[in-house]
């Protein structure tokens, strides 16, 4: 009885910790990937950002008025048409939901747990991930802007 109850609580704590670690790691991997691809674009190592050859807007280096929006749109295409490691991943806290969300996160709240939000602010790609509740606690989320 008591040992079983303690075991369930300990197991749930362990699985939540593993899910949080998964989100932290995945968020960091996506950040590194975006930084690498934008660097390749800006240094002439590739002709199109995220290899999205379907639009001249994605031609490297990004010489458009809103490079963040263009880079985000190319990334949306990349995730939508690719078989990358994180493209088909699910939110570990809500298995029926996709991991990556292309939307501004608005007011930070606990419904963001387990998602990787990708947005833009015209100059860069905004990345936001909540790995632990409460999400509004700065220690529980990653929020950054990647300038292409």
Each predicted region: which residue ranges?
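Amphipathic alpha-helical segments typified by the pilin-like N-terminal helix
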Residues: 1-29
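N-terminal alpha-helical signal peptides/signal-anchor transmembrane segments
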Residues: 26-45
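Periplasmic/extracellular, small/polar-rich flexible segments of pilin-like filament-forming proteins
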Residues: 39-148
């Amino acid at each position: 009885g008591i040992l079983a109850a303690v075991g369930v609580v300990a197991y749930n704590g362990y699985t939540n910790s593993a899910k949080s670690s998964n989100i932290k790691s995945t968020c960091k991997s996506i950040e590194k990937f975006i930084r690498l691809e934008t660097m390749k674009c800006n240094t002439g190592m590739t002709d199109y950002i995220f290899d999205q050859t379907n639009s001249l807007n994605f031609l490297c280096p990004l010489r458009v008025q809103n490079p963040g929006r263009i880079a985000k749109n190319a990334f949306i295409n990349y995730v939508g048409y690719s078989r990358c490691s994180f493209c088909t991943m699910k939110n570990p806290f809500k298995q029926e939901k996709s991991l990556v969300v292309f939307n501004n996160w608005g007011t930070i709240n606990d419904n963001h747990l387990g998602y990787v939000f990708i947005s833009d602010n015209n100059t860069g790609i905004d990345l936001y991930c909540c790995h632990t509740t409460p999400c509004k606690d700065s220690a529980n989320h990653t929020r950054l802007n990647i300038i292409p």
